[in-house]
Every structure is written in C-alpha cells, then in structure tokens.
Amino acid sequence: MKRNDPCWCGSNKKWKHCHYPTKPERPLDNLRQLYASRYDIIIKTPEQIEKIRKACQVTAHILDALCEAAKEGVTTNELDLLSRELHKRHNAIPAPLNYGHPPFPKTICTSLNEVICHGIPNDIPLQNGDIMNIDVSCIVDGFYGDCSRMVMIGEVSEIKRKVCEASLEALNAAISILEPNLPLYEIGEVIENCAAKYGFSVVDQFVGHGVGVKFHENPFVAHHRNSCKIPLAPGMIFTIEPMINVGKKEGFIDPINHWEARTCDHQPSAQWEHAILITDSGCEVLTLLDK
C-alpha cells in the first residue's frame, strides 16, 4: 500500500493523512476500536460469534418448519401459533413480538403478494397462487438471528415465480462477492444489476442491518446503488435482504396498522434474507440451515 493511496478505513482521505503507517492487516483489537469509534459498528468477538451462530441456526430451523407448514387453506395466524410453539421448544424468544412503536403484535412477519415487508399474520387462509415471505428473528441466550424466505402456495403466476427467483438470485450474487475490505456499496451494485436483468426494481425504503448483539445494529446495508464506502472487516455480522418489486420501487405503510409496507402499484414483491459473518478470507452464511 502506498502513502498516497486511499486509506483502507473508507474515510476518503489519503493513507498518509489518515491511518499511516497502520496497514489493513492490523491487530483485531485495534480494528474493533476503530470500527466502534468511526462507524458505530460492533466487530464481534469469537465468543459472541459462536453464540450468534447458535441463534442463527435456531432461527433457520424455525423458519424451515414454518415454510413446510405454509399450505393452501392455512392462515398466517396459525403459522404464528406454530411459531410460538417452536420458539418455546428451542428456548428462544421471538424478537418481533412487541417490538417498535406501535408494538408489533405477532412473533413473525408474513408478507403476501404486494406486501413488501412487515406483514402481520391474520385469519385469512392462504390461497392457491399466493407468494409469501416468512421472516423469523430469534433471541437465543441474549443473541439474535434473523432470516426470511419466500414460499409459493400452489400454482403461482409466471411473474410471481420470476420475482421470487430474482430476489434469491440477487441475495446469492451479493453473498458471492463478500470479503474483507470490500466497500459496502458493492452489495447494492450487484443487487441492482441482478434486478435489472428481469426488468424489476429494488426497494430503497428498507435496508439490511447489523445483527447479533442487538436486533438492529450498524451498518445499514442498502440494496440499491449508493455511495457507502465502509470496508467490510472480519467479525462484522449483518443481514442482506433484498426486496425486489415487479413494478415501481416505491411503497407505502399501511395507515391503519402502521407496519405493513405495500407496493404503491399493487404489483408483487419478493424478499429473501440471510445473516452473514465476514471472515478472514470471505464470509459464512450463519442462517444457512445446517440439517
């Protein structure tokens, strides 16, 4: 690294005017302090990582069971009741329950068709042709896991199938580039390019986020094109959860329940989510189900 190169910390200053002579291969304690002070990002310790890994696996197992139970004729309230049973079985706490203002009333989010995210379970049976995102967030021994998946009910339309596939493809494409020192904005670039292949749009009202010690931490991970140059570092844990719309990217919040976000043109939306750890050589998908 040369003195006139941009500093590895993402400050947009030259290395000689910033962290010179400290190189990117810096001691982990220094890295942890730097990211806490500069970005308010928690670089997790090995002990924290192990506990977050456990929370993420519990979260993934609960999500898998809920997706298996999501069938035509089942209500999302019934899925919420199953979620409560599964959380108890795993000695886990559902993070969404009573979270926020107004308090979220259920243990999971179930977002159908044109609902972008934060759908509230209800007594309406699932119908043939529905697509649904189930979002599960668990607290296990004080640490958090977070992931979501799309479910297709019966025979769905070609456009609904495509938007589900596009969201998953965008998530996997973003994960494939993750490594230390990658600028955060590269994630949004990859996702935008993936959505554009299908002629779809990327929601920019909601973002991924740091997770593990808290439910929502820094950094906020934009899925659209942006200019965030924070470099990824080993020990960072965050979600990537691209929300892809068939039509326009804009959505609106339900004026009655103040939670559900819907597409403004009532076109379908899809989302997949994983929690990911940045490692020394790449990344680990913590919510990838280990059966």
Curated annotation (Swiss-Prot):
Annotated binding of a divalent metal cation 2, by residue: 146, 209, 241, 273
Catalytic activity of the protein: Release of N-terminal amino acids, preferentially methionine, from peptides and arylamides
Summary of the function given for this chain in its UniProt record: Removes the N-terminal methionine from nascent proteins. The N-terminal methionine is often cleaved when the second residue in the primary sequence is small and uncharged (Met-Ala-, Cys, Gly, Pro, Ser, Thr, or Val). Requires deformylation of the N(alpha)-formylated initiator methionine before it can be hydrolyzed.
Cofactor comment text: Binds 2 divalent metal cations per subunit. Has a high-affinity and a low affinity metal-binding site. The true nature of the physiological cofactor is under debate. The enzyme is active with cobalt, zinc, manganese or divalent iron ions. Most likely, methionine aminopeptidases function as mononuclear Fe(2+)-metalloproteases under physiological conditions, and the catalytically relevant metal-binding site has been assigned to the histidine-containing high-affinity site.
InterPro entries: Creatinase/aminopeptidase-like (IPR036005), Pept_M24 (IPR000994), Pept_M24_MAP (IPR001714), Pept_M24A_MAP1 (IPR002467), SEC_C_motif (IPR004027)
Disulfide bonds: none
GO annotation (BP), single: proteolysis
UniProt gene name: map
E.C. designation(s): 3.4.11.18
Cofactor requirement: Co(2+); Zn(2+); Mn(2+); Fe(2+)
Alphabetical keyword list: Aminopeptidase, Hydrolase, Metal-binding, Protease
Top-level enzyme category: hydrolase
Oligomeric and partner information: Monomer.
Name of the protein in question: Methionine aminopeptidase
Binding positions for substrate per the UniProt entry: 118, 216
CC annotations in GO: cytosol
Binding site for a divalent metal cation 1: 135, 146, 273
PANTHER family assigned: METHIONINE AMINOPEPTIDASE
GO molecular function terms listed in the Swiss-Prot or TrEMBL record: initiator methionyl aminopeptidase activity; metal ion binding; metalloaminopeptidase activity
Any Pfam family hit: Peptidase_M24
Similarity annotation: Belongs to the peptidase M24A family. Methionine aminopeptidase type 1 subfamily.
